[in-house]
């Protein structure tokens, strides 16, 4: 009985560690997305999207290739771009993640 409880506790800890690792990966993707915008690095920005992603941003609707072109084109005329990440709230449910990433952008035109 005691061994079973230890095993269950270990499984719970492993699940929590894997969820934490998944959340950190999402935070890294968010950071790389902002870095790609700030450095005008389309390759880095593109790397955060799945190939079959659909981007719905109001002013752009479509796939990641077009979205990256849209962003890089819009930002290249600026003197500087600085995106700062704020609170990041992520919930993991089975094989899906849901959440919000807040950011502040300072753009020098």
Model-derived segments and spans:
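Short, low-complexity N-terminal intrinsically disordered segments enriched in polar/charged residues
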Residues: 1-35, 39, 47
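Conserved small/polar residues in nucleotide/adenosyl-binding loops
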Residues: 107-109
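A solvent-exposed, acidic/Ser-Thr-rich amphipathic alpha-helical stretch
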Residues: 41-105
């Amino acid at each position: 009985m005691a061994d079973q409880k230890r095993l269950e506790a270990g499984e719970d800890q492993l699940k929590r560690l894997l969820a934490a690792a998944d959340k950190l990966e999402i935070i890294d993707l968010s950071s790389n997305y902002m870095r790609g915008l700030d450095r005008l690095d389309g390759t880095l920005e593109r790397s955060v999207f799945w190939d079959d992603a659909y981007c719905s941003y109001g002013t752009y609707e479509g796939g990641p290739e077009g979205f990256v072109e849209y962003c890089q084109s819009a930002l290249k005329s600026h003197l500087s771009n600085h995106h700062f990440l704020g609170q990041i709230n992520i919930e993991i449910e089975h094989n899906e993640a849901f959440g919000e990433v807040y950011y502040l952008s300072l753009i020098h035109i």
